[in-house]
């Protein structure tokens, strides 16, 4: 970022938010294809190999020439450019990746400028980056709420909506026209290309740009909550800012555009306890209000998406549920608020009586059916959950096979460490252990029983997590449990993404 700020001071066009000239700066492509910033790499001989920045320099030279973006239909028939195949795809891929870095720069600088002098006020904690930090919040807040909106955020029906949303932040019309050009070409790729190799190229090579645009779209949608937070006297909670995207919240807090119709909206939604969380395209809005108020929220969201983003959202994408009678399918957990009763015996003088104490308890559990479906899709078991061997791994060494299965078990145990009932997790681990044994027995042309007898208990040790072993030493445990491992709930604040098997839909 310091390098970008230095160029910003030297380049007058940048000072006026003109991003188009940055397309011709070589350091942009150096940043775009640096593995430290972007795991996607460019291509060299074909579609699947690396190459040096020499190709980028040749691309820059080509861009300075006339008609560098006028790619006719005849270009698709040419086989080579700079010794590479797929001329058109390679051109647009490199420019798109560089453009993705360019459009991120103004927002990054805006965030940095908004944080100047505020470091002491903003609590900086790496734990806030963990997606598991959401669950302690749910555990603390949702116990006292009545209803929840289960929201599936709609995707824009047309990519032009993303461009129109972005134009309020960028003054450079040339960059917006270039963005439209990328979208048009990507649409043509989708309609023309049918080979498996090219489809894979499409899905991965433009990921950074499309993720940025989608996150920007969601950020614009969530700015409504910032308006409510700033305008309403009922929404003064200091923790409210932590519920939004932390990357964008403080930047939008200062530069938010005031809406004249906000007073009408506030009259419509005056209530003191709305709580909002989101992960990817799914959001939850919980409230202590009545069912009528939640219906107002529901139809407001539908009207808001339709009027502001021109997105038609069907009412069935938003469900109104009562927390006491509903399980939330969120971030790979089935979470519910259930009553937990306990009986206390009290004695006063010679009289004794029983008191029943009822309290709410947040109960996240492991969903067995989706996980078994993911395992079946990955060929670890069949659709009924019966383990099968992973035949594609039989060419690996025994240690590699055991390490792969053990790593999957440890990752799942790590992610579901906060589950209140781990019976389903143990079933998943059993499927993986037996699938590993079947894979090894198939490789050595032996039976599963004979193979397990030969390996003994050391084979099972590979599937225990280090956390289970350590927690068993420092925390109390039930002596009746097998192996003496700790069975309590623990939320780990170092998890930044969902495991592929958990998020496989």
Swiss-Prot record:
Top-level taxonomic group: Eukaryota
Keywords: Chloroplast, mRNA processing, Plastid, RNA-binding, tRNA processing
A Pfam family per the record: Intron_maturas2
Biological process annotations from GO: mRNA processing; RNA splicing; tRNA processing
Major localisation: plastid
Assigned GO CC terms: chloroplast
GO terms, molecular function: RNA binding
Localisation per UniProt entry: Plastid, Chloroplast
Biological role stated in the UniProt entry: Usually encoded in the trnK tRNA gene intron. Probably assists in splicing its own and other chloroplast group II introns.
Family: Belongs to the intron maturase 2 family. MatK subfamily.
Name the UniProt record assigns to this protein: Maturase K
Organism (species): Gomphrena pulchella (Globe amaranth)
Gene name for this UniProt entry: matK
């Amino acid at each position: 970022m310091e390098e970008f700020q230095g160029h910003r001071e030297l380049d007058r066009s940048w000072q006026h938010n003109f991003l188009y000239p940055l397309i011709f700066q070589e350091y942009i492509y150096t940043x775009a294809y640096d593995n430290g910033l972007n795991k996607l790499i460019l291509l060299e001989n074909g579609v699947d190999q690396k190459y040096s920045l020499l190709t980028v320099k040749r691309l820059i030279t080509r861009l300075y020439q006339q008609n560098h973006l006028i790619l006719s239909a005849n270009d698709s028939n040419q086989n080579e450019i700079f010794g590479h195949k797929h001329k058109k795809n390679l051109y647009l891929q490199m420019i798109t990746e560089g453009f993705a870095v360019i459009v991120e720069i103004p927002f990054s600088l805006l965030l940095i400028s908004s944080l100047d002098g505020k470091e002491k006020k903003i609590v900086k904690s790496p734990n806030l980056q963990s997606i598991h930090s959401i669950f302690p919040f749910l555990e603390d807040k949702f116990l006292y709420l009545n209803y929840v909106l289960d929201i599936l955020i709609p995707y824009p029906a047309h990519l032009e909506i993303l461009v129109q949303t972005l134009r309020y932040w960028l003054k450079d019309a040339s960059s917006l026209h270039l963005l439209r050009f990328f979208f048009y070409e990507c649409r043509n790729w989708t309609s023309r290309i049918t080979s498996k190799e090219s489809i894979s190229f499409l899905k991965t090579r433009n990921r950074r740009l499309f993720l940025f645009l989608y996150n920007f779209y969601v950020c614009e949608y969530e700015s409504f909550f910032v308006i409510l937070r700033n305008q309403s006297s009922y929404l003064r909670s200091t923790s409210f800012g932590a519920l939004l995207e932390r990357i964008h919240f403080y930047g939008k807090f200062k530069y938010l555009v005031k809406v004249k119709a906000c007073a009408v909206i506030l009259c419509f939604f005056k209530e003191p306890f709305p709580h909002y969380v989101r992960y990817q395209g799914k959001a939850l809005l919980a409230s202590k209000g009545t069912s009528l108020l939640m219906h107002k929220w529901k139809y407001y969201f539908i009207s808001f998406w339709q009027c502001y983003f021109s997105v038609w959202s069907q009412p069935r994408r938003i469900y109104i549920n009562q927390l006491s009678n509903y399980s939330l399918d969120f971030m790979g957990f089935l979470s519910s608020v259930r009553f937990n009763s306990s009986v206390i015996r009290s004695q006063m003088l010679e009289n004794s009586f029983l008191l029943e104490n009822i309290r709410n308890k947040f109960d996240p559990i492991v969903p067995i059916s989706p996980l078994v479906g993911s395992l079946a899709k990955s060929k670890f078991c069949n659709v009924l959950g019966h383990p099968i061997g992973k035949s594609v791994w039989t060419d690996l060494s025994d240690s590699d096979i055991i390490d792969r299965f053990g790593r999957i078990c440890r990752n799942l145990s790590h992610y579901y460490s906060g589950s209140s009932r781990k019976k389903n997790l143990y079933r998943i681990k059993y499927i993986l252990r037996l699938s590993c044994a079947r894979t090894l027995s198939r490789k050595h042309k032996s039976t599963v029983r004979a193979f397990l007898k030969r390996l003994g208990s050391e084979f099972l040790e590979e599937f225990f997590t280090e956390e289970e072993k350590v927690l068993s030493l420092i925390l109390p445990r039930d002596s009746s449990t097998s192996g003496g491992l700790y069975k309590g709930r623990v939320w780990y604040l170092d998890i930044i993404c969902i495991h592929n098997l958990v998020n496989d839909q």
